[in-house]
Amino acid sequence: MNLNFMISKDVLQGPWAGLPVAWKKDLSFDEEAYRSDVARTCAAGVPGVYTAGTTGEFYAMEFDEWKTIARVTVDECRCAGTPVMIGVTSTYALGAARRAAFAAELGADAIQVALPYWMDIDDRMIIPFFQEVTEACPGMALSIYETRRTKKTLTLEQHRAVFDCTGSYLAVKSNEGTLGCSPKGCEQLSEFVNVWVGEDNWNALGPYGAIGSASALVYMNPRVILKMFDLLSRKQWNELQPLTDQVKRLIEQGLRPFAARGFTDTGFDRLMGKASRFLTMNVNSRGTYPSATDEDVFALQKWMQENTPELLLL
């Protein structure tokens, strides 16, 4: 594997912006609005941008749409000089490998991939899967999207085996219920890969090595979230705590009415980005899952003005 041009582990740190896709009213791709929001996010100074995660609705687009959106994302990030990662998750290994090869062709810096999620993955399939995907994009950094939605969470030994066999595994997005979201697991993983957790966990897991996030909050308020990462980097835990508390309050209280209505990742994340007026794209997301509305944006704005006003100050 040729790793001569692979980005360093240090690049995959901080709040990488996992942007939603801009859709028109008819739910076709709104390239103009999307380019504008990617460019604005890059200009805000984020350490990196990625697309085709859950917020980016990789599961709700055709392969040709995915290719167009990936190309546009890389194009805008290259113009801005911002590192870029493309999500390549698929229901089958060849699908992920084809996406990884296309991301390499575009010149992306990294790929993010979860295990295939339709049928259960046997432990014996894990290493061959990551080998097949990374062999399709030699020289590109790998970030694992670890989530219980795939019906399989990795052990420390499996993470280490992926690290050893690929030579490109640099970061893991650790979600609730996975190894990196516990203090001990975060500390163990941080010995060889960067661990990303939600900003609401930075104060709890930063002391154990957490060093970034797959962030929806950074395009809600880049000023606050980049300040939080600076405090995390300098291990200023007392100063970080009040900001972490605001983020937790927003997630646990401000978003509660929308969770009760069945919102999922992209619904929440569009809503927050629109509430602060940082994102310009339409708030609509594709079904089957509930989509936020303009009325929802106004409702969250009102709640934030009363409860977390600093998060609205761009």
How would you name each of these model-derived features?
Residues 34, 66, 70, 96, ...:
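A general structural signal for well-ordered alpha-helical segments in protein cores
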